[in-house]
């Protein structure tokens, strides 16, 4: 299995759940930008306070904030990692590619988890996060489609993109992911 992975997909697609399973199984570092940002928010850091205002509106946190958090983690860990939730747009992909080039850790495979908007909304409302409500979810899905979708073409052109269906049980989706990554 490849050991430098990137998971793409809309919010609520199960990226975090699947990333945790793959990382536990393979011993990889799981870098979830959403979790990293929530840690900053719960820690009450200056970055966390800025991020909270942005996240509560359903908007994306600035590239500079996110890349600096990711960089700190990757510099300390080079064995195997999975990025979940970053990059979300071509500008972030460029920043990430520059960072990974500097530390000689290029992405080996990008996995796109695809799923229907109605299922996504149900899943997100069921998570119980304070930044998940119907208006915020609708805005997040629109932002995803507008800004993140071009990444599919970007990584497809690089020959490192694989897509899987994210519907079904956690176990079924995990089996599809393992097959795609082998």
Swiss-Prot record:
It is an enzyme of class 2 (transferase). Its EC number is 2.7.4.3. GO terms for cellular component: cytoplasm. It is found in: Cytoplasm. It comes from the Bacteria. Consists of three domains, a large central CORE domain and two small peripheral domains, NMPbind and LID, which undergo movements during catalysis. The LID domain closes over the site of phosphoryl transfer upon ATP binding. Assembling and dissambling the active center during each catalytic cycle provides an effective means to prevent ATP hydrolysis. This is Adenylate kinase. It comes from Prochlorococcus marinus (strain SARG / CCMP1375 / SS120).
């Amino acid at each position: 299995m490849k050991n430098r992975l990137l998971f793409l997909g809309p919010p609520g697609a199960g990226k975090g759940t699947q990333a945790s399973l793959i990382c536990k199984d393979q011993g990889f570092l799981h870098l979830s930008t959403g979790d990293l940002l929530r840690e900053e928010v719960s820690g009450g850091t200056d970055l966390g306070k800025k991020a909270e205002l942005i996240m509560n509106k359903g908007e994306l946190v600035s590239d500079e904030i996110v890349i600096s958090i990711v960089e700190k983690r990757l510099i300390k860990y080079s064995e195997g990692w999975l990025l979940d939730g970053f990059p979300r747009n071509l500008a972030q992909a460029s920043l990430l590619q520059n960072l990974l080039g500097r530390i000689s850790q290029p992405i080996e495979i990008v996995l796109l988890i695809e799923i229907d908007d109605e299922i996504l909304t149900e899943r997100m409302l069921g998570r119980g996060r304070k930044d998940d409500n119907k208006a915020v979810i609708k805005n997040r899905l629109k932002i995803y489609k507008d800004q993140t979708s071009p990444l599919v073409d970007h990584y497809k052109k690089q020959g490192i993109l694989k897509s899987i269906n994210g519907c079904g049980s956690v176990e079924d989706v995990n089996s599809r992911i393992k097959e795609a990554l082998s």
